[in-house]
Design a protein with these regions (language model features):
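N-terminal subdomain of lithium-sensitive/metallo-dependent phosphomonoesterases centered on the IMPase/IPPase/PAP
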Residues: 1-37, 177, 185-186, 206-217
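Acidic active-site catalytic centers that drive phospho-/nucleotidyl reactions
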Residues: 19-20, 35-38, 42, 142, ...
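DPxDG-like acidic metal-binding loop motif
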Residues: 26-85
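Short hydrophobic/aromatic-rich beta-strand segments that constitute the beta-sheet cores
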Residues: 77, 84-87, 106, 153
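An extended, acidic
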Residues: 92-217
Protein backbone atom coordinates (compact mmCIF):
# COMPACT_ATOMS: atom_id res chain seq x y z
CA UNK A 1 0.00 0.00 0.00
CA UNK A 2 2.87 2.37 0.76
CA UNK A 3 4.43 1.79 -2.66
CA UNK A 4 1.13 2.29 -4.49
CA UNK A 5 0.39 5.44 -2.48
CA UNK A 6 3.82 6.88 -3.26
CA UNK A 7 3.40 6.25 -6.99
CA UNK A 8 -0.08 7.76 -7.00
CA UNK A 9 1.23 10.86 -5.24
CA UNK A 10 4.02 11.52 -7.75
CA UNK A 11 2.60 9.96 -10.93
CA UNK A 12 -1.19 10.18 -10.51
CA UNK A 13 -1.88 9.58 -14.20
CA UNK A 14 0.15 6.36 -14.51
CA UNK A 15 -1.33 2.86 -14.52
CA UNK A 16 -0.46 0.46 -11.69
CA UNK A 17 -0.64 -3.34 -11.73
CA UNK A 18 0.10 -5.66 -8.83
CA UNK A 19 -1.24 -8.85 -7.30
CA UNK A 20 -2.36 -6.89 -4.24
CA UNK A 21 -4.16 -3.91 -5.82
CA UNK A 22 -5.15 -5.38 -9.18
CA UNK A 23 -5.01 -3.21 -12.29
CA UNK A 24 -5.51 0.52 -11.85
CA UNK A 25 -6.10 1.68 -15.42
CA UNK A 26 -5.56 5.40 -16.07
CA UNK A 27 -5.24 4.94 -19.85
CA UNK A 28 -1.60 5.99 -19.60
CA UNK A 29 1.28 4.82 -21.78
CA UNK A 30 3.17 4.17 -18.53
CA UNK A 31 2.41 1.27 -16.19
CA UNK A 32 4.08 0.41 -12.88
CA UNK A 33 4.26 -3.35 -12.20
CA UNK A 34 4.79 -4.02 -8.50
CA UNK A 35 5.80 -7.10 -6.54
CA UNK A 36 6.10 -5.82 -2.96
CA UNK A 37 7.30 -9.16 -1.59
CA UNK A 38 8.80 -11.67 -4.00
CA UNK A 39 9.75 -14.81 -2.11
CA UNK A 40 6.81 -14.75 0.29
CA UNK A 41 7.31 -18.34 1.48
CA UNK A 42 10.99 -17.67 2.16
CA UNK A 43 10.09 -14.56 4.16
CA UNK A 44 7.45 -16.43 6.17
CA UNK A 45 9.94 -19.22 6.91
CA UNK A 46 12.73 -16.90 8.02
CA UNK A 47 14.83 -17.58 4.92
CA UNK A 48 16.60 -14.40 3.74
CA UNK A 49 15.91 -14.80 0.00
CA UNK A 50 13.14 -12.30 -0.71
CA UNK A 51 12.83 -8.78 -1.99
CA UNK A 52 10.89 -5.98 -3.64
CA UNK A 53 10.60 -5.68 -7.41
CA UNK A 54 9.23 -2.71 -9.35
CA UNK A 55 9.10 -2.41 -13.14
CA UNK A 56 8.05 0.51 -15.33
CA UNK A 57 6.49 -0.22 -18.70
CA UNK A 58 6.11 2.20 -21.59
CA UNK A 59 3.21 0.82 -23.59
CA UNK A 60 3.87 -2.96 -23.56
CA UNK A 61 7.63 -2.90 -23.03
CA UNK A 62 9.56 -2.83 -19.73
CA UNK A 63 11.93 0.15 -19.79
CA UNK A 64 13.15 0.39 -16.20
CA UNK A 65 13.37 -2.04 -13.27
CA UNK A 66 14.59 -2.01 -9.70
CA UNK A 67 14.96 -4.90 -7.25
CA UNK A 68 15.92 -4.59 -3.60
CA UNK A 69 17.04 -7.37 -1.26
CA UNK A 70 16.57 -5.89 2.23
CA UNK A 71 18.46 -8.50 4.26
CA UNK A 72 21.54 -8.18 2.05
CA UNK A 73 20.98 -4.43 1.45
CA UNK A 74 21.52 -4.98 -2.27
CA UNK A 75 19.88 -2.84 -4.95
CA UNK A 76 19.72 -3.94 -8.58
CA UNK A 77 18.69 -1.54 -11.33
CA UNK A 78 18.39 -1.55 -15.10
CA UNK A 79 17.20 0.91 -17.71
CA UNK A 80 16.57 -0.05 -21.32
CA UNK A 81 19.73 0.50 -23.33
CA UNK A 82 21.79 1.71 -20.36
CA UNK A 83 23.01 -1.45 -18.65
CA UNK A 84 22.38 -3.30 -15.38
CA UNK A 85 23.78 -2.37 -11.99
CA UNK A 86 24.12 -3.68 -8.45
CA UNK A 87 24.62 -1.03 -5.76
CA UNK A 88 25.76 1.35 -8.49
CA UNK A 89 28.33 -1.01 -10.03
CA UNK A 90 27.76 -2.44 -13.49
CA UNK A 91 27.05 -6.19 -13.66
CA UNK A 92 27.28 -8.58 -16.59
CA UNK A 93 26.69 -12.21 -17.49
CA UNK A 94 29.76 -14.19 -18.69
CA UNK A 95 28.89 -15.01 -22.30
CA UNK A 96 31.27 -17.98 -22.54
CA UNK A 97 30.16 -19.81 -19.38
CA UNK A 98 28.81 -23.31 -20.04
CA UNK A 99 26.14 -25.32 -18.25
CA UNK A 100 28.61 -27.98 -17.12
CA UNK A 101 30.54 -25.33 -15.18
CA UNK A 102 27.49 -23.55 -13.76
CA UNK A 103 25.18 -23.60 -10.79
CA UNK A 104 21.66 -23.70 -12.22
CA UNK A 105 18.41 -22.65 -10.55
CA UNK A 106 15.31 -24.77 -11.19
CA UNK A 107 11.90 -23.81 -9.82
CA UNK A 108 8.55 -25.54 -10.09
CA UNK A 109 5.44 -24.90 -7.98
CA UNK A 110 2.39 -27.05 -7.33
CA UNK A 111 -0.09 -27.53 -10.14
CA UNK A 112 -2.85 -30.04 -10.80
CA UNK A 113 -1.43 -30.52 -14.32
CA UNK A 114 0.51 -33.70 -13.59
CA UNK A 115 1.80 -34.02 -17.16
CA UNK A 116 3.34 -30.56 -16.89
CA UNK A 117 5.02 -31.52 -13.61
CA UNK A 118 6.32 -34.78 -15.06
CA UNK A 119 7.83 -33.02 -18.07
CA UNK A 120 9.44 -30.50 -15.74
CA UNK A 121 10.94 -33.25 -13.60
CA UNK A 122 12.41 -34.98 -16.66
CA UNK A 123 14.04 -31.68 -17.61
CA UNK A 124 15.28 -31.32 -14.03
CA UNK A 125 16.97 -34.73 -14.13
CA UNK A 126 18.77 -33.83 -17.35
CA UNK A 127 19.95 -30.51 -15.94
CA UNK A 128 21.26 -32.26 -12.81
CA UNK A 129 23.37 -34.54 -14.99
CA UNK A 130 24.69 -31.76 -17.22
CA UNK A 131 25.24 -28.85 -14.80
CA UNK A 132 27.78 -28.32 -12.05
CA UNK A 133 25.00 -28.39 -9.45
CA UNK A 134 21.45 -27.20 -8.73
CA UNK A 135 20.50 -24.27 -6.54
CA UNK A 136 17.12 -22.64 -6.03
CA UNK A 137 15.71 -19.84 -3.91
CA UNK A 138 12.40 -19.90 -5.85
CA UNK A 139 12.44 -16.10 -5.83
CA UNK A 140 13.78 -13.07 -7.66
CA UNK A 141 17.19 -13.91 -6.19
CA UNK A 142 17.65 -16.74 -8.73
CA UNK A 143 17.35 -14.28 -11.62
CA UNK A 144 19.47 -11.59 -9.97
CA UNK A 145 22.23 -14.12 -9.35
CA UNK A 146 22.10 -15.00 -13.04
CA UNK A 147 22.42 -11.30 -13.92
CA UNK A 148 25.63 -10.96 -11.91
CA UNK A 149 27.12 -14.29 -12.98
CA UNK A 150 26.71 -16.30 -9.76
CA UNK A 151 24.24 -18.70 -11.39
CA UNK A 152 24.64 -19.84 -14.98
CA UNK A 153 20.92 -19.89 -15.62
CA UNK A 154 17.42 -20.36 -14.26
CA UNK A 155 14.34 -22.29 -15.35
CA UNK A 156 11.13 -21.29 -13.59
CA UNK A 157 7.92 -22.94 -14.76
CA UNK A 158 5.50 -20.73 -12.82
CA UNK A 159 5.89 -16.95 -12.91
CA UNK A 160 3.62 -13.94 -13.29
CA UNK A 161 4.27 -10.63 -15.00
CA UNK A 162 5.24 -8.94 -11.72
CA UNK A 163 7.77 -11.74 -11.11
CA UNK A 164 9.72 -11.67 -14.34
CA UNK A 165 9.12 -8.60 -16.53
CA UNK A 166 11.64 -6.47 -14.63
CA UNK A 167 14.01 -9.38 -14.05
CA UNK A 168 14.02 -10.03 -17.79
CA UNK A 169 15.09 -6.43 -18.37
CA UNK A 170 17.86 -6.67 -15.77
CA UNK A 171 19.15 -9.90 -17.33
CA UNK A 172 18.94 -8.49 -20.85
CA UNK A 173 20.82 -5.33 -19.87
CA UNK A 174 23.45 -7.54 -18.20
CA UNK A 175 24.03 -9.28 -21.54
CA UNK A 176 21.80 -12.33 -21.11
CA UNK A 177 18.54 -13.55 -22.59
CA UNK A 178 15.17 -14.66 -21.27
CA UNK A 179 12.87 -16.89 -23.34
CA UNK A 180 9.71 -18.87 -22.75
CA UNK A 181 10.12 -22.64 -22.58
CA UNK A 182 9.40 -22.91 -26.31
CA UNK A 183 12.33 -20.63 -27.11
CA UNK A 184 10.24 -17.62 -28.08
CA UNK A 185 10.58 -14.04 -26.91
CA UNK A 186 8.21 -13.07 -24.11
CA UNK A 187 5.57 -10.47 -24.95
CA UNK A 188 3.34 -8.60 -22.54
CA UNK A 189 0.03 -6.90 -23.30
CA UNK A 190 -0.89 -4.52 -20.50
CA UNK A 191 -4.42 -5.26 -19.30
CA UNK A 192 -6.24 -6.80 -16.36
CA UNK A 193 -6.05 -10.19 -18.11
CA UNK A 194 -2.25 -10.09 -17.87
CA UNK A 195 -2.57 -10.82 -14.14
CA UNK A 196 -3.80 -14.35 -14.81
CA UNK A 197 -1.19 -15.35 -17.37
CA UNK A 198 1.59 -17.79 -16.44
CA UNK A 199 5.07 -17.37 -17.94
CA UNK A 200 7.35 -20.46 -17.84
CA UNK A 201 10.77 -18.94 -18.52
CA UNK A 202 14.43 -19.75 -19.07
CA UNK A 203 17.19 -17.18 -18.53
CA UNK A 204 20.96 -17.11 -18.75
CA UNK A 205 23.59 -16.45 -21.37
CA UNK A 206 22.65 -17.35 -24.95
CA UNK A 207 24.67 -20.59 -24.93
CA UNK A 208 23.11 -21.98 -21.74
CA UNK A 209 19.57 -20.96 -22.69
CA UNK A 210 19.92 -22.75 -26.03
CA UNK A 211 21.21 -25.86 -24.26
CA UNK A 212 18.27 -25.87 -21.83
CA UNK A 213 15.83 -25.44 -24.70
CA UNK A 214 17.28 -28.57 -26.33
CA UNK A 215 17.01 -30.48 -23.04
CA UNK A 216 13.40 -29.34 -22.58
CA UNK A 217 12.31 -30.09 -26.16
Amino acid sequence: KLIVAAIKAVFPRHNILSEECGFIDKRSEYTWIIDPLDGTSNFASGIPWFGVLITIFKDNLPVMAGAYLPVQDEMYFAEKGKGAFKNGEIISIPEDKELKDSLFAFCVDYTEDQDFINRGLETYKSIVRQSRNIRSTNSLVDFLYVAEGKFGGVLNLFTKVWDISGLGLIISEAGGVMKNINGNDIHFSISKDLMDENFPVIAGNKKIVEQILVINS
